[in-house]
From Swiss-Prot:
Natural source organism: Corynebacterium glutamicum (strain R)
InterPro entries: A-D-PHexomutase_a/b/a-I, A-D-PHexomutase_a/b/a-I/II/III, A-D-PHexomutase_a/b/a-II, A-D-PHexomutase_a/b/a-III, A-D-PHexomutase_C, A-D-PHexomutase_C_sf, A-D-PHexomutase_CS, Alpha-D-phosphohexomutase_SF
Superkingdom in the source lineage: Bacteria
Protein name: Phosphoglucosamine mutase
Enzyme Commission identifier(s): 5.4.2.10
PROSITE patterns found in the cross-reference section: PGM_PMM (PS00710)
Record keyword Isomerase present: yes
Disulfide partners: none
Modified residues (Phosphoserine): 104
One Gene Ontology term from the biological process aspect of the record: peptidoglycan biosynthetic process
Annotated catalytic residues: 104
Amino acid sequence: MTRLFGTDGVRGLANEVLTAPLALKLGAAAAHVLTAEKRVDGRRPVAIVGRDPRVSGEMLAAALSAGMASQGVDVIRVGVIPTPAVAFLTDDYGADMGVMISASHNPMPDNGIKFFSAGGHKLPDHVEDEIERVMDSLPAEGPTGHGVGRVIEEATDAQDRYLEHLKEAVPTSLEGIKIVVDAANGAASVVAPKAYEAAGATVIAIHNKPDSYNINMDCGSTHIDQVQAAVLKHGADLGLAHDGDADRCLAVDKDGNLIDGDQIMAMLAIAMKENGELRKNTLVGTVMSNLGLKIAMDEAGITLRTTKVGDRYVLEDLNAGGFSLGGEQSGHIVLPDHGTTGDGTLTGLSIMARMAETGKSLGELAQAMTVLPQVLINVPVSDKSTIVSHPSVVAAIAEAEAELGSTGRVLLRASGTEELFRVMVEAGDKEQARRIAGRLSAVVAEV
């Protein structure tokens, strides 16, 4: 049986794969698993539910809320708000669980559900497996009378609580910094511009008018050309691009050059080391982190640890080792002292704080590492499980690694959220990386 949970919750085409009946069952099962030990002395467990603006969000929120209420859980709806805000609010409200309804950077027709435990932590695999296990075994009857959970619509102070949290996390004045922010017509459309303005920056917001259908449509972190053009048009000091649920952030310098998550991590790691804030002088990245990040961290006397792709795995390593900075090339940056998950708005504030504190431009700060040419090709496949062990793929990888030697690397991995296999090649020059990646992708496509 195919596992329901992927690397970032449950995700699929809304109303076909991710249906209201499935959301109802998920809500009930998650409530049962996550709140079973909280029902003492008649106490009623509490859940926080947020969503991004896509059209199917209300439908799924209603179904999820009904499922949780059927298990005796009070549900507090916090409306359209970023994923990291739901994680924060789960802890801030003292709730027993949190739920975010979003498919992140995926197209509008998709949607997803991700759960947080008490304290705002993403769930480990074994807890997700337990939720799946009990989905079809819960009795149809639940609590009755006073035992039924309530649904509290749209908590009025949720956004203000989150904004105050961001202000406390990064108190540096950003006065004099001019920024373009692309909110992807998503969950950060209101919050991100407000947070940057509150810190003193001059903000030009684009793609910040969601209409339920335009989330991620030719905008946001997957269409970086939009913020690049806007930065050049407005003469801004930098641009920031968020994804649909605003747990990631990519940046653009004043000349329109992309600054990815690896470069952001490099500049923040060096700054935190200088300030004595980089615990154990260690940064946590993933297997997709550019080889240039490893080289830069070695030169700075910082240890780079790598995990599987997915900010949940970065988080697990951060928590297990007691480290203070981690993230992904895609722009998920995690600062455990200020949050339990990747937070695009917090990342944006941290980048600008570093600019304000040093007086340097983003382009200058990004020189903390040299990005080696990297080519990534997504190959549609029908069965991700057989690719890496197929003899023709094994032979093609060996041939590529022999050609690259110590000047590059090859990584093949299955997407955790889509029916894709990702082929990544780093090399001394772009053309070599492109040629080898194309060759490998052709082999994968034929399997």
